[in-house]
């Protein structure tokens, strides 16, 4: 299972986009991709 800290750190770059209508940061896309990859391989 993924820890809350792992999810938090991977989505940190998305907070402005999700809450303040800020431009989508490249780090957000990277974090989401990382989480997706971890979710597919983490029991």
Curated annotation (Swiss-Prot):
Keywords annotated in UniProt: Antimicrobial, Fungicide, Lipid-binding, Plant defense, Transport
Domain of life: Eukaryota
GO BP terms, alphabetized: defense response to fungus; killing of cells of another organism; lipid transport
GO molecular function: lipid binding
Pfam families: Tryp_alpha_amyl
InterPro entries: Bifun_inhib/LTP/seed_sf, Bifunc_inhib/LTP/seed_store, Plant_nsLTP
Role according to the record: Plant non-specific lipid-transfer proteins transfer phospholipids as well as galactolipids across membranes. May play a role in wax or cutin deposition in the cell walls of expanding epidermal cells and certain secretory tissues. This isoform inhibits the hyphal growth of several fungi in vitro.
Subunit record text: Homodimer.
Similarity remark: Belongs to the plant LTP family.
Entry protein name: Seed non-specific lipid transfer protein-like
